């Protein structure tokens, strides 16, 4: 079993500068939101459904394919922890969020089955990468 430090040390940071948006719809609109993601073929997005809302983190241009959102927050970059996360390892997000908090960088996080995704303000991306780079294997800017 790996420790959080060991796992992060072999993890590349996959960076998409964006801009990304975080948007929210009524839960009943989840089908339309997912259809919009399929139509725009972004390849990158995070969708979460709970009893209060359907939320999505997606490239800003993808909003054109979506039903009107009731809330939109703009100006995010997306950082993906590029190594599959081991579910028995504790402290990965704590280490990442601690480093960003120490640098004063706001953070949102979402987990997929095997990877964690972080979203930070675009204007703080360089600060975020400077804070995270000592923990991780490398930084790869994808877009």
Predicted regions and their residues:
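Regulatory modules associated with amino-acid/nitrogen control
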Residues: 1-99, 103, 127-143
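A cross-kingdom feature marking solvent-exposed beta-strand/loop segments within repeated
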Residues: 103-116
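A generic "binding-loop/recognition-motif" signal
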Residues: 114, 124-125
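Short glycine/threonine-rich loop-to-helix capping motif typified by GTGT followed
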Residues: 119-122
């Amino acid at each position: 079993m790996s420790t959080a430090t060991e796992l992060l040390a072999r993890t590349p940071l996959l960076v998409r500068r964006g801009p990304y948006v975080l948007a929210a719809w009524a839960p009943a609109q989840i089908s339309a939101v997912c259809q919009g993601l399929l139509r725009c073929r972004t390849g990158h997005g995070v969708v979460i459904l709970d009893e209060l809302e359907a939320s999505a983190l997606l490239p800003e241009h993808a909003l054109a394919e979506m039903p009107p959102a009731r809330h939109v927050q703009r100006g995010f970059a997306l950082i993906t922890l590029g190594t599959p996360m081991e579910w028995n390892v504790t402290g990965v997000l704590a280490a990442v969020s601690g480093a960003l908090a120490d640098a004063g960088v706001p953070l949102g996080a979402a987990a997929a089955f095997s990877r964690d995704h972080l979203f930070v303000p675009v204007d703080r991306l360089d600060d975020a990468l400077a804070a995270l780079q000592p923990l991780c294997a490398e930084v790869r800017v994808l877009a």
